Amino acid sequence: MTQAFPSILQKIIQDKTTWIAEKQAQLPLASFQDQLERSDRDFYQAMQQGSKQRPSYILECKKASPSKGLIRAAFDLTEIAEVYQHYATVISVLTDEKYFQGHFADIAQVRQRVTQPILCKDFILSEYQVYLARYAQADAILLMLSVLNDERYTQLATLAHQLGMGVLTETSNEAEFARALALKAKVIGVNNRNLHDLSVDIQRVAQITQHYADQIPPETKIISESGIYQHQQIRDLRHVADGFLIGSSLMQHTDLNHAVRSLLFGEHKVCGLTRPQDVRAVYQQGALYGGLIFVTHSKRCISLRQAQELVTQAPLRFVGVFQDQSIAFICHLATQLRLHAVQLHGNESHEFIRQLRDELPVNCEIWRAICIESSGTSPCQIVENKNIDRYIFDSKTHQQRGGTGKTFDWQLIPHHLKPKSMLAGGITPENIPLALAQGCLGLDLNSGLETYPGVKSHQKVVAAFAQLR
């Protein structure tokens, strides 16, 4: 043990020591040691897939925590595994009972439903816990240098490797990170949480790894732990981390699939969808929203019947695009298609929007397009409307509002609206990095991904979302 525990951690370790003694009396090692088999899921091989260009993700099953208390009351491991299997490199399962409301039995329950390695996340202090983790079917364990000296760490890591399990070596400061390097840990986690007071500094991983940048072997993988709540944070830290361990920020959302996609891929929309295969392709690549255009003069206009087929192809959040159409028409389509939002591209007044809000289903958002001349130079003057959930900043010409395939001067977007706005207009795989740098909530792509109007190029879709990730 290290000589001075942080106060909160010290209490946890005291309780864990008691738990180990009680568990050993209840389930002696001799009763199951002969039944143990080596893991057949390679944690290290899985983590080698991660890179600073395309990070790996350790997604966590976490019911509660000391810092947040109960996080997910409806803790359905089957539901969680069903979502995580599509996105995770490794799945972490909390097994601490007192502080995280976890159980070792949770490991097998998740593992039997997925193909990824399972990480046993606990305060591991003894060989007994390592054996117990493998008995519970874990493929890797967490070892925390904040509670283990080098000799103890080496003993536990060696045993884990003998059982075919990998080790995620957790550090929380520069001294521990230096120890992890000296111990030749293959996967090093940097916990951005202060173990003294449970506060989070998301820049800790950057500060520590940059200090030791010239000492980190190229094959060593760095994982950022704790504090990831937005996709932009992942983008900001990718230059220092090969992967991210994420739990609390996902577990707090009812719609887990949406939460994972939003966090991993960002909140981006592909508009002008007309074909089933395009809906499936953009969802597979990471789109969160799909735009269906009902503006009659648009080259991408579709009928209700076409839309009904499209919305069954993938669980995108669908947005209907309208322009100066009746409230009755908009509400009819919103109800029939169970739209996530309606996007207004015309001259709809504040009173029209107020009435529309009263008539729409309560869970259907209203998005408002603000179209700026592609050659314009005057800053936008926008009177905010409490009934508008999101703004779309798009380009226009004298002939057309939106869907022009042209960009506008992005400096004209009011800075204070960027956190609730999406950027549209002439966005292509080539200018996505610059578009992302504008700081809007997400991007809205359409003609820049097309072969011709209404037909998406799957090659361009793949190229675009590679940039977006």
From Swiss-Prot:
Keyword Isomerase on entry:
yes
Protein's UniProt keywords contain Electron transport: no
GO biological process, any: L-tryptophan biosynthetic process
GO molecular function annotations of the record: indole-3-glycerol-phosphate synthase activity; phosphoribosylanthranilate isomerase activity
For the region Indole-3-glycerol phosphate synthase, what residue ranges are annotated? 1-267
Residues covered by region (N-(5'-phosphoribosyl)anthranilate isomerase): 268-469
Q: In which pathway does it act?
A: Amino-acid biosynthesis; L-tryptophan biosynthesis; L-tryptophan from chorismate: step 3/5; Amino-acid biosynthesis; L-tryptophan biosynthesis; L-tryptophan from chorismate: step 4/5
Q: Which reaction does it catalyse?
A: N-(5-phospho-beta-D-ribosyl)anthranilate = 1-(2-carboxyphenylamino)-1-deoxy-D-ribulose 5-phosphate; 1-(2-carboxyphenylamino)-1-deoxy-D-ribulose 5-phosphate + H(+) = (1S,2R)-1-C-(indol-3-yl)glycerol 3-phosphate + CO2 + H2O
What subunit structure does UniProt give? Monomer.
**Record-given protein name:** Tryptophan biosynthesis protein TrpCF
The gene for this chain is: trpC
